[in-house]
Every structure is written in structure tokens, then in C-alpha cells.
Amino acid sequence: MAPEPPAPYRDARPFALMYIPRLGSTWNKPVLEGTKTDTLKKGLGHYANTTQLGQKGNFAVAGHRRTYGDPFKDFPKLRPGDAVVLTDGDDWFTYVIDKRPYRTLPTDVQVIDPVPTKSGYTRAGRYLTLTTCDPEWGHSHRLIVWGHLDSTQPVESGKPEALRR
């Protein structure tokens, strides 16, 4: 029998913590379900129509660049090879960024498709998409980074390598 699909995340509720070492050793933000304004005031928002952590498809997350804690203020510093680590309290999920930030228009919703083709991906996988506004104090464009799931491990086994450097 196939494993049961995970239960849906609860709207506007936190379900994970995200760590991006490139943005600082103390940088971590809650990830909540949904991308409504009130949700993004509290942390990062998971696009509800995208896959869940570690699942096949595209786990996509939005965050403000400025305002509400400036979670993605330093987004342009992200580089290929950078780790994005998430935990849901049970497991660690380490994604690795594959490309430098890509600038596009807000109407370019294909960036969060299950296989985001502008990323260069051509087949199904376990992907991560991060989105934020550009310019820093505006919202005429979006910056996007894409990554792939590199590893998972239970929380009991300790922090992943990317957080121990």
C-alpha cells in the first residue's frame, strides 16, 4: 500500500521553520500556510497550491523583502549551492539553490509550477521556489530562486551539516 498523503497545512498557521545560513547564522523564520497579507505579516508564506515539504513537486514560499521583519531583505545575496533548511519538528529538509536570483513580473505565476521550466528543470522532482518583491522598497517585479531537495533526516539525528558549519 502507498503511504497516506500528509494532512493539509492549516491556513495562516505556522508549520515549519526555515533557516538560510547565507543570510546569517541566526536567520530563521516561521513558515505559515498561505500568502495573504495578514499571513505574510507574521513570517514567510507557503503558496497553498504547491506541494508540501519534501514531497514531489514544488514547495513554494513567499516573503517580504522590506517590512514585517524584512525576512528576505538580503535575497539578492543567495547563490547556487546555498542551503535552505526547513524543519517541521519531525524532520529536517535540506534544499540546495541551483541558480542566482531570477527577476520577473508578478504575473509570471509559472515560477511556482510543479516543474518550474524557467528554472531549467525539465522533469518532475522535489523542488523549492522562494519569491520576494523587487525592487527592495517596491513591488513592480519579483525575485525568484529555485532549488532541489538534497537530503532529509529525522530531527533526532541532530542538525543537518548545513547548519553545523
Regions inferred by a protein language model and the residue ranges of each:
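Extended boundary segments
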Residues: 2-48, 163-164
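Extracytoplasmic/periplasmic soluble domains downstream of a signal peptide or transmembrane helix
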Residues: 36-50, 55-165
